[in-house]
Amino acid sequence: MEGYREGVNEAGGEFLDNETQYANATADLAVTAMEGIMSKYPEGVAIICSNNDDMALAAARTAKDNPNYAKTIFLGFDGQKSAVEAVLNGELTMTAAQNNFDIGYKAVETIVKILNGEEYGDVDTGTEIITKDNAQARLDNFADWLK
């Protein structure tokens, strides 16, 4: 949450601490949460940040027919194929794609360090922000990865 808060504040926005909605990482609960947000803020909000792509897609689809949410940014995390396709077709604004290969590789590398009694620090596997500008390239990568 701290990262969201810092980002919103740095952009000059107002982070609504009391509006954090927990959806247990499920699309169904994200729909309910988004309906509640639209009810409480009928004028719209600037951004909806979700902790995974499924929740972001559910929120965006719930709000799609509400004209006051037409300019709302919907951000997901994971960079899964369905979300990248949704970014490309304009249904989702962006997703923060994780590098699954590096996550696995770095996890094994860190485990080996632990087993060998070696020091290890924070592990950053990187993130790529997927927008309409680079969504097709990411989809092309999926095709290559799945050969």
Predicted stretch roles:
Residues 48, 74, 88, 102, ...:
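Short glycine/serine/threonine-biased micro-segments
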Residues 4, 19, 23-85:
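Hydrophobic alpha-helical
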Residues 6-11, 99-147:
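Hinge/cleft segment of the Venus flytrap/periplasmic-binding protein
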Residues 17-20, 74, 95, 129:
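Conserved beta-strand scaffold positions in the cores of enzyme catalytic domains, especially
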Residues 89-101:
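Short beta-strand elements at the ligand-binding edges of bilobed clamshell
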Residues 14-17, 71, 91-92:
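A generic structural signal for alpha->beta connector loops
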Residues 7-14, 33-40, 62-66, 86, ...:
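Structured segments of extracytoplasmic/periplasmic soluble domains
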